[in-house]
């Protein structure tokens, strides 16, 4: 049943109908459409469009429909309705007859769909925040169990300074914390109810929109009807948050792929998250991580698509805005799946502690400690930086680590070096000295783990 037609003397061509209809994807808004309709039925009582008895009949029928939808949402797709709004109204009329035709009084599909997608997005935010917390928890627990695992930290993919595997884990906890708070910020901005805005100019009935917003679990009603039906900021914000978080997950995946490589051999991924080769029997490929990295592009693509869709739209509603749904549905599904898979990757990970320590001892990653040592002896840092650079060149030439050079060899470059230099060149010293807040010292890492556990509720 179409919700329009009196203006037309010919039926829509099937080719146009197939092109125009959106039920194949907006069926996912069925619950929100029904819940919004229940709220609207109550508002219509307040302006004497419906009696109390009529509203009760409608609410009963809508609740029955809600139960049916929740038990088998895919059944909706067997229908030929144009969109989810048409489908709900058609099913309601099947249940209560002509009374169902009164429900759309004062309402437009423009404010109806704006409500539906906002309600759906709000529910997704809460679910995604839980999923982000679950990955954070897995990272924190992994960090807690790997505080002893020393490894190289990198810049430019070159060994830079020693860190711990735990410190690496906690870096991603912090990235995810920002993702979590961005979701919360987006929720606050989308928590205004557009229902009652009509097609663009507002409803003709003196409905208390603040009460309607409260009934539908919004903090307030929107303030401008034209903006209310034109606004898709909440979708763009969620796509932006998802894209940035997927970039974080992609970096996590890339690190894991490198750490898992035969060249690094820092970690071993479980058989449960890897696959083999159809030709090379020895292969164990990090497919879970590669797919996380690969799926990042499609989420970012959805953001770019939505920004491009809205950039040139005149106010208010245009059919272009139907394109808002498939992108957000796919992007948030993908983000959720990747968060879940990243946590699964960590579930059985094995850290090769001996190999990470061996790698941390190479590459002169204690060179900065030597520069700081010279500064403590009164050498200006810029001079000490140059001296240590020359010392490293010499050490490379004689195939020694800095910690293996003799005092006499050190003194070729600076006469302030003495036997106490060896105390600061050990891996443990390198870690211990980074003791400012956020640093890699075991004490600070332990504090960061404890703080994160408190923040995400692991101590409960």
Swiss-Prot record:
Pathway assignment: Amino-acid biosynthesis; L-arginine biosynthesis; L-arginine from L-ornithine and carbamoyl phosphate: step 3/3
GO BP term, example: L-arginine biosynthetic process
Keyword check for DNA repair: no
One Pfam family matching this protein: ASL_C2
Reactions listed under catalytic activity: 2-(N(omega)-L-arginino)succinate = fumarate + L-arginine
The species this protein was found in: Actinobacillus succinogenes (strain ATCC 55618 / DSM 22257 / CCUG 43843 / 130Z)
Annotated PANTHER family: ARGININOSUCCINATE LYASE (PTHR43814:SF1)
EC number: 4.3.2.1
InterPro entries given in the database record: Arg_succ_lyase_C, Argininosuccinate_lyase, Fumarase/histidase_N, Fumarate_lyase_CS, Fumarate_lyase_fam, Fumarate_lyase_N, L-Aspartase-like
GO CC terms: cytosol
Membrane among keywords: no
Class of enzymatic activity (EC top level): lyase
Disulfide bonds listed in the record: none
Cellular localisation: Cytoplasm
GO molecular function annotation: argininosuccinate lyase activity
Highest taxon in the source lineage: Bacteria
Protein family per UniProt: Belongs to the lyase 1 family. Argininosuccinate lyase subfamily.
Name listed for the protein in its UniProt record: Argininosuccinate lyase
Keywords: Amino-acid biosynthesis, Arginine biosynthesis, Cytoplasm, Lyase
